Amino acid sequence: MERVAVLFRRTCNSENCSKGRRPLRERPLAGLFFCSLPAPLSIPCLSLPGSNPGDFVPKVKTNYICNSCGYQSAKPLGRCPNCQAWNSFEEEVPTASTSGKSGRGGLGGYGGVKGGKLTPLSTVGRREEPRTPSGIPELDRVLGGGLVAGGVTLIGGEPGIGKSTLLLQVADKVASRGGTVLYVAGEESLEQIRLRADRLGVAADLQMTRDTRAEHIAALLEEHKPALCIVDSIQTVTVEGEGAPGGVAQVRDGTAMLTRAAKETGTATVLVGHVTKDGTVAGPKVMEHIVDTTVFLETVGAFRLLRSVKNRFGQAGELGVFEMRGEGLIAVDNPSAAFLAERPLDVPGSVVAATVDGQRPMLLEVQALASKTPYPNARRVVVGLDPRRVDVVLAVLERRLDLTLGGLDVYVNLAGGLKVPDPGLDLAVALAVYSAVVGRALPQNVAVFGEVGLAGEVRSTQMALRRAEEAGRAGYKRLVVPPGLDGQAGVKSVEEAVKAVWR
């Protein structure tokens, strides 16, 4: 038996070998192996890792992606280490198209040409993005002036809250002015949409399709170049070779493909997104980074609030107020009057407060009720406000105004169903609780705002001038506000505020 040093590669023409490997001396560095077989015999096949990677079939690597924030892991995790979400990981098997043109390439919401070309900032022209008015003033307010050509807007909200109704009204307004509207119906039949359109009084002719393949939608945008494209919903859009519809990869890559098509064709595009049980848009968080604008539609009492949380073409935090009626979502032009319409007069514990929700000033009613407690420990119930701030205000009233609250249950409510974490409501809470305890109602023409500190001082708040202007438009002549506001004397402490109200 002789030891033979043999250089191998992966092809073989031996009669006894079905793997296709044969000795090859003229290939250097392919791998040196010592065989103890007799030289005339066929050399057995050996697996040579790394000698020729093209001969191997690569092992499919499975990733797990958090459907909340897009965090990737090699194994499923119970809790995402990035966003702390529980049971949010979904399996994703990379396909051939994942690294291709429909994959992660160009995920950002930009419309530039790919490549290595550099452009100096000084040579870039200055121009405003053209806007298309939606025909609904409250929606235009939230979007910053209207729909931007080539901009992509993501609208989220609970099922049945009115997303499709609002967008069908917008489509009617745009089409009635001569613009072409493409409506992609992924969840409803065309007959169902026709019935809703008849109920809403939609008279314009819309171009509709039920084809939810992202490649085909992009082709329609390129062919027709509509003024507005509505996709209802993004969770029904599919991309070839990217897994099941509604999955992380489908939603991510479908959004990226439609965004690129919208930028290239200059089409204002609106994507409808489902929400999870905690109120966030279903799908990977990267989807919200791709789009230009993200707005949410939520229910507050009898009203619908449209709130922007991201806007590349305007100011985020804008708020629009709507009311659902038989003819659709109707814009509420004066939210302050709407929220104060049912306010009782001459009742202790009721105060009109000037607040700011997002970027919009409005007047709301702060209510307080104090009653003797039958329990050893008095209760504190807060609705619509920050409970910790209310506890601070109650402590200030006890310490600085000698108001006894230890044996009283105190209830504080922000009427209307809104939840506003505004420090400027502190003074309204203080006066409402004081009014409820002493049993004296505030005058009808008084509105207040201001932050209360631990020393009992009244501090200034953001957007004080806009708050005062909103109160003036509503007819409130007396303002109890912090010092420093033009035309107003201002109060420096809670004690001064009490004296100013009941002077």
UniProtKB/Swiss-Prot annotation:
Segments for region (Lon-protease-like): 409-503
Residue ranges of the motif RadA KNRFG motif: 310-314
GO MF term list: ATP binding; ATP hydrolysis activity; ATP-dependent DNA damage sensor activity; damaged DNA binding; zinc ion binding
Recorded superkingdom: Bacteria
EC number of the protein: 3.6.4.-
Chain positions covered by the region annotation Disordered: 118-138
Matching InterPro entries: AAA+_ATPase, DNA_repair_RadA, P-loop_NTPase, RecA_ATP-bd, Ribosomal_Su5_D2-typ_SF, Ribsml_uS5_D2-typ_fold_subgr, Rubredoxin_2
Pfam families with a match to the protein in the record: AAA_25, ChlI, Zn_ribbon_LapB
Residues that coordinate or bind ATP: G157, E158, P159, G160, I161, G162, K163, S164
Disruption of the gene: reported phenotype: Moderately decreased resistance to gamma and UV irradiation, no effect on H(2)O(2) resistance. Slightly reduced DNA synthesis rate even in the absence of ionizing radiation (IR); after IR chromosome fragment assembly is delayed. Double recA-radA deletion mutants have lower rates of DNA synthesis than the recA deletion alone with or without IR.
Coiled-coil ranges from the UniProt annotation: none
GO biological process: recombinational repair
Zinc finger motifs (C4-type), residue ranges: 66-83
Keywords associated with the record: ATP-binding, DNA damage, DNA repair, DNA-binding, Hydrolase, Metal-binding, Nucleotide-binding, Stress response, Zinc, Zinc-finger
Free-text note on domains in this protein's UniProt record: Has a putative N-terminal zinc-finger, a middle region with homology to RecA with ATPase motifs including the RadA KNRFG motif, while the C-terminus is homologous to Lon protease. Absence of the zinc-finger domain gives a slight increase in sensitivity to gamma and UV irradiation, absence of the Lon protease domain gives slightly increased resistance to gamma and UV irradiation.
NCBIfam families, alphabetized: sms (TIGR00416)
Family statement drawn from the similarity comment of this UniProt entry: Belongs to the RecA family. RadA subfamily.
Biological role: DNA-dependent ATPase involved in processing of recombination intermediates, plays a role in repairing DNA breaks. Stimulates the branch migration of RecA-mediated strand transfer reactions, allowing the 3' invading strand to extend heteroduplex DNA faster. Binds ssDNA in the presence of ADP but not other nucleotides, has ATPase activity that is stimulated by ssDNA and various branched DNA structures, but inhibited by SSB. Does not have RecA's homology-searching function.
Name of the molecule in the record: DNA repair protein RadA
